[in-house]
């Protein structure tokens, strides 16, 4: 995603270059569809909350369908698109999610680029702190393998969780349907009277308030791209709205939708 933002190359070309440099697997499916990030956030959740690895009710979305147009739009709006894995403990219930987000371009996470990874930890009374380092390439991979191998040879059988399973807790998981997010929505539509009215009616019916709306014409004057930034709304209502809008006859391409995070 960083490379797409820097070069304006398409996803396919950037992926092929990443393979050649050793930053992506020869079969990068798990990196692209979010499975690799899903496994990582499950392990980190277990470590952070002293719980068993919880595989249920986790939202997972990959990066394979991100278009250059949305990366460009994000820049114009003051955002960057980042693939985040997030775990939160709310009222003793675990929420885990993996998906692309729009992040303020001036934020710390908004400036984690290239092969750098970052982990943000927030709690009481420690507040918030960040760990940053390279997450791909020969050096980081070799270092991790050698470290784990040496620990095993030294007889450290508690890896990777440090404490026995019997001392871990079971924490109930909930999905993100009841969580609230601001969002970016892009709709490619037939440019005709009544389209904007139909879009806003659908959003209003699902209790979604429009914060900002931009209409960009296509080269062909018959079509236009509608960009909507919403106020915070329930995730289930956002998803329902996208589904309903996708079925409108005036929508010519699959709608694009990104949650907006303030981290």
What name fits each language-model region?
Residues 17, 22-26, 86-88, 94-190, ...:
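Catalytic, metal-anchored helix/loop core of enzyme active sites in primary metabolism
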Residues 6-7, 29-37, 59-66, 130-133, ...:
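Catalytic cores of large soluble enzymes that bind and process phosphate-bearing ligands
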Residues 28, 32, 37, 49, ...:
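General "foldedness" signal
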Residues 3-5, 9-111, 116-118:
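Substrate-binding/catalytic subdomain of NAD(P)-dependent oxidoreductase enzymes
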Residues 15, 19, 66, 71-81, ...:
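Short secondary-structure transition/capping segments
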Residues 149-263:
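A conserved regulatory-domain signal marking ACT and ACT-like small-molecule sensing domains
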């Amino acid at each position: 995603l960083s490379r797409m933002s820097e070069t304006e190359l398409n996803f396919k070309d950037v992926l092929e270059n990443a393979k050649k440099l050793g930053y992506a697997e020869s079969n990068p499916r798990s990196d692209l569809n979010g499975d690799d990030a899903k496994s990582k956030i499950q392990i980190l959740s277990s470590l952070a909350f002293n719980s068993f690895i919880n595989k249920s009710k986790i939202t997972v979305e990959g990066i394979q369908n991100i278009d250059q147009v949305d990366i460009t739009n994000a820049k114009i709006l003051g955002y960057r698109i980042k693939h985040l894995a997030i775990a939160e403990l709310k009222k003793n219930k675990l929420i885990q999610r993996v998906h692309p987000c729009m992040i303020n371009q001036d934020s710390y996470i908004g400036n984690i680029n290239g092969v750098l990874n970052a982990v943000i930890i927030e709690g009481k009374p420690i507040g918030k702190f960040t760990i940053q380092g390279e997450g791909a390439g020969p050096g980081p991979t070799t270092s991790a393998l050698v470290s784990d191998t040496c620990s095993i040879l030294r007889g450290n059988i508690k890896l990777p969780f440090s404490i026995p399973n019997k001392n871990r807790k079971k924490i109930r998981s909930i999905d993100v349907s009841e969580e609230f997010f601001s969002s970016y929505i892009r709709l490619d539509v037939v440019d005709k009277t009544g389209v904007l009215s139909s879009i806003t009616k659908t959003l209003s019916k699902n209790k979604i308030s429009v914060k900002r709306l931009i209409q960009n014409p296509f080269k062909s004057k018959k079509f236009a791209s509608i960009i909507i930034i919403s106020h915070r709304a329930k995730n289930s209502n956002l998803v329902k709205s996208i589904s309903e809008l996708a079925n409108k006859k005036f929508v010519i391409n699959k709608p694009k939708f990104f949650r907006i995070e303030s981290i």
